[in-house]
Regions:
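Short, charge-rich amphipathic interface segments used for partner binding and complex assembly
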Residues: 3-55
Length: 55
């Protein structure tokens, strides 16, 4: 299972990747990465809730 810290680092990396795609004006890559960002953010949210609830 991925830890909170690992998922946070994944999200940060994806955001950097999105920034690079934005600089290249690559809309297809931007869309693909934005989906990955949304999925990672959702995982991070769940890990945060689990942490708060002591799981």
């Amino acid at each position: 299972m991925i830890t909170f810290t690992e998922e946070y680092l994944i999200l940060k990396t994806l955001i950097r990747m999105y920034d690079e795609a934005l600089k290249k004006a690559d809309p297809v890559l931007m869309l693909e990465i934005s989906v990955d960002i949304a999925e990672s953010a959702e995982k991070l949210e769940q890990l945060s809730c689990d942490h708060i609830n002591g799981h």
